[in-house]
């Protein structure tokens, strides 16, 4: 299964915020959209960074409530790992596990933002694959038993 299969089923819409958005505003965006991370982008198509709930928690623990007034650019991850639509889901799962992150932006061939995949998306697609495999094996066993 490829990343393109995930994007096709969930859509390529990505919630972004400009780098000068304050952390308080970011929290509102996360809550409103019921998401765990947001791509930081000045134009909605280039990736300047990514900010997750974990980044916010770490910043709050380190700097206190004052961080809520800071721009997201102060707490975002600037070196964003990305993937392309043609990548295999297993590669993505391995990268997410190794890097210990739960969201990865998908980029087009020219590096423009083209979607985002979460670990939940990966788990959902793997469950679907396993169910199909289980059903195929069950059918095979039933056919062999008759």
What are the functions of these language-model segments?
Residues 1-13, 52-97, 119-146:
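Tandem CBS (Bateman) regulatory domains
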């Amino acid at each position: 299964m490829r990343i393109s299969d995930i994007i096709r089923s969930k859509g390529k819409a990505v919630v972004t915020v400009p780098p000068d958005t304050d952390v308080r505003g970011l929290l509102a965006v996360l809550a409103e959209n019921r998401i765990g991370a947001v791509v930081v982008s000045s134009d909605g198509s280039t990736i300047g960074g990514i900010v997750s709930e974990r980044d916010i928690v770490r910043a709050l623990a380190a700097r206190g409530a004052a961080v809520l007034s800071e721009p997201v650019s102060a707490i975002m991850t600037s070196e964003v790992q990305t993937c392309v639509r043609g990548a295999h889901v297993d590669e993505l799962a391995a990268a997410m596990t190794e890097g210990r992150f739960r969201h990865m932006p998908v980029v087009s061939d020219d590096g423009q933002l083209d979607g985002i995949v979460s670990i939940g998306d990966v788990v959902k697609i793997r469950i679907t694959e396993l169910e199909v495999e289980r059903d195929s094996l069950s059918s095979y066993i039933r056919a062999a038993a008759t």
